[in-house]
Amino acid sequence: MKKINKENFKKTLSTFTTGITVVATNNNSILYGKTINSFSSLSLSPPLVLFSLDKKSSKLKIFKESKAVSINILSYKQQIISNNFAKKNPNWKEINYDVLNNGNPIIKNCISNLDCK
């Protein structure tokens, strides 16, 4: 089997159209968010979703230790938000959001939002 070129593989996979979400949480009164496209429904009964983070992600430990997260399903008009949370240190000051009772941020004007445990 041929060795796969990482850049060609990435370019090929980028042609697959998928939804974009921002997964967010609150850890010790600090808000964290990450752009995620590896989001999927897992089950309707019980209602379960899943998302994946790279093992090398600086936010992996934070999300693993979180008891709850918000999942914000972005529209095609929210590329600026997607790009913001794709950065290592996103700027929450640029984002229009509310805070849920559990402390997690929920981004306003998304297609949909989920509050997940």
What are these regions (language model features)?
Residues 1-117:
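Active-site-proximal mixed secondary-structure blocks
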